[in-house]
Amino acid sequence: YDVFRSIWGYRDYVIRAFNANKPFDRFITEQLAGDLLADGDQDALVASGFVRAGISSGEGGTIVEELWNNLIRERTEAFGAVFMGMTTGCAVCHDHKYDPLSQRDMYSMAAYFGNIREKSWTGDDLAWEPNQVLCQAADRPAFDAALGRRAKAEAALRDLAAKESKNINAWLGTGPKQVREGLLAWFPLDESKGSDVTERIGGKKYPCEGSPPVWDDYPNLVTSFRTADNTRLACADVGDFEKDQAFTFSGWIRLFEVVSHPEFGTNSGTIISRMDGGDLRGWNLYVENNQLLVQLIHHWPDNAISVSGDTLPRPGWVHLTVSYDGSGKAAGVKVYRDGKAMALTVTADTLSGSIRTPAPLMFSRRAGADTSSLPSRQTGFEDVRFYTRALSAEEAARLPFEDPVAGILARKPDFLAQADVRKAVAGRQDPYARVWTPFEKRSAAEAYFSRHPEQRDALLAEIAAAQKDMDALTAKQKPPVLESGNDPKLLYKMLSDAYEEKIGALTLVCREKETPAFAHILARGEYTQLKERVYPNTPSFLPPQPPGSPPNRLGLAAWVTSSDNPLTARVIVNRMWQELFGTGLVESSEDFGVVGMRPSHPELLDFLAVDFREHGWDAKRLYKMLVMSAAYRQSAVLSPEKSDRDPHNAWVSRGPRYRMDAEQIRDAALQAAGLLNTEKLGGPSFKSYVPPGLFSSVVGTNCCGYENHHGPVLYRRSMYILNKRTMPQPDLEVFDGIDRLASCARRNRTNTPLAALALMNNTTFLEAARALAEMAIKKVPTDDAARLNFMAARLLSRPLTTKELAALTNAQQIFIAEMNAERAGKILAVGEIKRDESIDPVQHAVWMGLASMLMNSDAALNK
């Protein structure tokens, strides 16, 4: 858990974007949906890492569903705080108590962020997918061209159903057939809650024993059923076939990411069976090292049929149909994947005995103990069927796509007439008329394209070709250590090699799923209490998405930057004001709601927001206007009158004065000492000084063997420090540096003795004080007052006052009286920078103490 995450490419993108003064609306769009932009490039793709910068975990015992919902919730809360100035997290369990944000609104927004091709449980994978290896500058034009081809093809694929709507509706008018003849048992598995499943033909309910099942993602129209690690679903009266009986079983199947079995190895397990795990009599469908196998067994291996087929994806939904003609021969077994016949290899064809067994039909395992049941844990199922005949190839082709649509049309005859959304809206007076949901539309489109695949296949081929070109351009840049696990030494080497540009960078990005985005409203916010399904939508009390914008993150970005959106520009300019003046025009910059603070100058906030938007979202122009204003340039001196009437400077009666942020304090100290390394822009994170043994308790991750970097990289700006969420940098945390467990729009500013102690004892600040003292001694060899003013100019940007000079001169005499060679040697040994041995150590230590005092002053710490 909380292992190293390779995402410095996103940080570098942000730096470049501000330096280039990228229009802020484009900056927002790239971060929310850079992967979906048809005119995007590598920078835009990297920018989408903003969405991926949330929590992840590889911790054993993690409940995947809980982690997944926490991940989506964190993204939605971050979006609300960053772009809306709203506490969306208050609507997780119920409607917002103060703001007009309903629980439906919250989960509708969450739907935008839950449709990425990722897994929440990472297994401590350094290359948490989706990710992108960054190519070299020389290859950028070719890479951007390939990326553009992929984005355009993916956009065309998403729009293909709408483009072909007339043909789809005409095809629906022909009445797709349902495969019902010989249907013995049908498990739609659409209950969406509870531990019982219903067989639709006979209406019988079957209870799940052991762990309750999980109801989650689905490939078509309904919620799917997933077995947990110890779920047992047994159906004693289903699937009891003999070797001379023809039968078929089919269903949507989704294997979990990784399955490991101590006896049978990794990625092996039973999908569905009616077989005793002890004597192995019966039939079963299972995977061995992800390869699909179908078996009918009387006695293994001398009296059995066994065929092997395709390798199945992990994870990924596939529709499988297995038919057997009752011939007793392997040639009588047919397997279809997504409606297409699968090439099979016969590995046994000697069946002569009975395959009947008293063992029940089992999902995800065979009957028997765990040691013999070969379970395929965390396997998803939907629409599982059993027939008393061998289906034809044409029928098998209809099962994955046409049959669900035919079922809908059979139950809802109005759907055909209402397939056109405009007609559906016009027909609201008809109690049966309604608009198709995104998944119903997708199912109809899938059914049509399964029969007319030419256009879709061409787009899929273009996507694959573009991806191949992208991979070829970045293959030589891929950091090899990402394949090598969690060895701390390898991680250290990777960071060092990347800094020296010996290897490339890998960064987390977004990649949208092909399926429509959705979410479930959760009762009381509990991940197990799924309620109504909702689709991407903006809050009901705000203007809707712009017409024609897609229901995904790209549409959300268009809404955020729309001139009709009353929040975004105000929230952004308020944060810019906060950065310069210390406090925003709305003090609660993360909460513009009822509970938040009212604007101190509402007309000014409105003016700045409109001005910012109408001048091309030009951030540098706005900053320039603010810093050149009379409000910013006035004196920060606090008079008694201002103290009484405006103690918190809410009315901007004086210039800004506030303590700098943690990173600024560290960087200012290093800059004053001449140590700050500004030679290189961007690059990987580095490991700064931390107290010895701080990470020794973090066992089993690539951070447990912490070793700080050495040489010039150790003195880079604080924005490049490697941060660990569960173990923040102590020298930054003491100055209210954030832990990055959640998005933070406004930092606290506290004043405790720990801050002074850190400045007097932390290695970074002591080393900076030593270097500044050495610089002062060399630059001003004799005059003590001039030397003190030299250090003040470096730290305070002004000469010392008479009172300050007298205090430091007095401190100098005290230090001289107390210092000796032994003590000086210990004090000067701090840090890695070698000192000039020609300087008297006692003198050096005295001036190091004076430099430290200046660093610890309010004048040095406050802006």
PLM features per residue range, with description:
Residues 1-39, 100, 145-170, 420-713, ...:
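Primarily short, surface-exposed interaction patches in extracytoplasmic proteins
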Residues 15, 36-144, 732, 744:
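Sequence context surrounding c-type heme c attachment/ligation sites in exported
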Residues 155-479, 483, 489-494, 501, ...:
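Extracellular glycan-associated modules
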